[in-house]
Amino acid sequence: MPGSTWELHLLLLLGLGLGSEQALPPPCESQIYCHGELLHQVQMARLYPDDKQFVDMPLSTAPDQVLQSFAELAATYNNTVPREQLEKFVQEHFQAVGQELESWTPGDWKESPQFLQKISDPKLRAWAEQLHLLWKKLGKKIKPEVLSQPERFSLIYSQHPFIVPGGRFVEFYYWDSYWVMEGLLLSEMAETVKGMLQNFLDLVTAYGHIPNGGRVYYLQRSQPPLLTLMMDRYVAHTGDLAFLRENIETLALELDFWAENRTISVSSGGNSHTLNRYHVPYGGPRPESYSKDTELAHTLPEGSWETLWAELKAGAESGWDFSSRWLVGSPNPDSLGSIRTSKLVPVDLNAFLCQAEELLSGFYSRLGNESQATKYRNLRAQRIAALTALLWDEDKGAWFDYDLENQKKNHEFYPSNLTPLWAGCFSDPAIADKALQYLQDSQILNHRHGIPTSLQNTGQQWDFPNAWAPLQDLVIRGLAKSPSARTQEVAFQLAQNWIRTNFDVYSQRSAMYEKYDISNAQPGGGGEYEVQEGFGWTNGVALMLLDRYGDRLSSGTQLALLEPHCLAAALLLSFLTR
């Protein structure tokens, strides 16, 4: 709002200025997997290339015995155990990663789901068959001993088997699972989806929210809230209203978590608007990235360590771990030590919640509870008003994250800026065409291998030149909502770009990846770990695009559809034919 005088009121102050004397609680109670001297010494000794490996190891004996043995060992070395002795201790008291999981072949997997017949290009159809086959490789089931002896594991027990992302990610992850479920439903695997949904509903019942992932060290942070959307897709596919009726109050309970723990109020021109942010007021380094978080903290004054660690967890809660998006507005935006996730009101989080409010209102109406339907309908209307007042920029044709401290929008490009379009949280039908103009103005349509995560090359994995499958979906399906043939054609061309990149890399490497480098159409890089194969949400988005555009998509062997001038030609053609 140009010329507005902004007045900021924060309802939650934790995390916006913690002093060194204000120690935050650890991410979980375990003195092995979440905090304590054993965790510290093992991780700082860097026994493994990836810190996640140690905190994923099951215990061989009871945790009290392990801690007592470690205390005795440490006492013999003046409390600093040599690396060789640490290695021996871990070998004696811990089991190899993955012992508590077993591979699982989904019982509802079938040879030839119907959507494959919609794919005209024979090479793409054969590739889609391979992607469909990957569900068998990504299925996991938790062994019963995790239920009977939970204290010996960092894994959180889930009753039903599930599909994992792949690579180092052998447990469930919250927001990944939405795009996985979309792919599973296309593969006609509704029973697998129902089981995964039930696991998530059980977690909400137990903890009040869905953790970031299926480990105890993830317990105090969530991820983008897509549970209600998952339920919507399952019910739309199956018509299973009984399952919805049984669990609708649990869906409402999850939204209560975000309302009670992640809410802020921002005033503009005398009007107060309630929105949400990512915010994890828990201390200590992330156990799965312990040494990196500790090293990063030592580049800062000791009094700011707790704030740093809380902001890193908030960045992980966003799903974008990490990105220039969470560094903007800081004194040193090139350093991860300046991360300030909780100081920003994210476009995507509020769009996801807006969509969930709309869906929940519709669910209650279908089940005959009009008072609850009205409640969530009103919450959605209030959120759309807040999105429009605080995050929408009419001149640029997009929404932007709002900086609470600096009281201004972050006008950098991120695909998340268009999430309200994907989520249907807008009132002006012309917004999709404005979004297209925004993409053109930002020169995003010049990238022929995918939509970049940002235009800033920081070395963080959620920045240029990486592109991620869910962000392609946000933009493509958002544009596809437009009644304009021109905008719909650009959505198709963006889908063609992404499918070609995925297909080409698969043709070279026989693998799907969590992210791609659009500067060279290869697997992505950067961030805290090596690029991972699998890969759940990448497979899901590819199947969604193949289903939506299967009659038009090309493997590229006959037509060169992907050069930047092709997009320009498509736009020109659409103008001439309107």
UniProtKB/Swiss-Prot annotation:
Name the GO cellular-component terms: membrane; plasma membrane; side of membrane
Note the Pfam families from the entry: Trehalase
> Where does the protein end up?
Cell membrane
- Residue positions the entry lists as glycosylated: N78, N261, N369
Lipid attachment locations (GPI-anchor amidated serine): S555
List the active-site residues. D321, E514
Its main subcellular localisation, reduced to a broad class, is: membrane
List residues traversing the bilayer.
none
Among Gene3D superfamilies, the record links this protein to: 1.50.10.10
Annotated signal sequence is: 1-19
Which catalytic reaction applies to this protein? alpha,alpha-trehalose + H2O = alpha-D-glucose + beta-D-glucose
Q: Which InterPro entries match?
A: 6-hairpin_glycosidase_sf (IPR008928), 6hp_glycosidase-like_sf (IPR012341), Glyco_hydro_37 (IPR001661), Glyco_hydro_37_CS (IPR018232)
Gene Ontology biological process terms from the UniProt entry? trehalose catabolic process
Q: Which residues form the propeptide?
A: 556-578
Q: Which domain of life is it from?
A: Eukaryota
Give expression by tissue: Expressed in small intestine, kidney, and to a lesser extent in liver.
Q: Which GO terms describe its molecular function?
A: alpha,alpha-trehalase activity
Keyword tags: Cell membrane, Disulfide bond, Glycoprotein, Glycosidase, GPI-anchor, Hydrolase, Lipoprotein, Membrane, Signal
* Entry similarity comment: Belongs to the glycosyl hydrolase 37 family.
What PANTHER family does the entry give? Answer: TREHALASE (PTHR23403:SF1)
- Assembly information from the UniProt record: Homodimer; disulfide-linked.
Q: What does this protein do?
A: Intestinal trehalase is probably involved in the hydrolysis of ingested trehalose.
Protein name stated in the entry:
Trehalase
Which organism does this record belong to? Oryctolagus cuniculus
> What is the taxonomic lineage of the source species?
Eukaryota, Metazoa, Chordata, Craniata, Vertebrata
Protein encoded by which gene: TREH
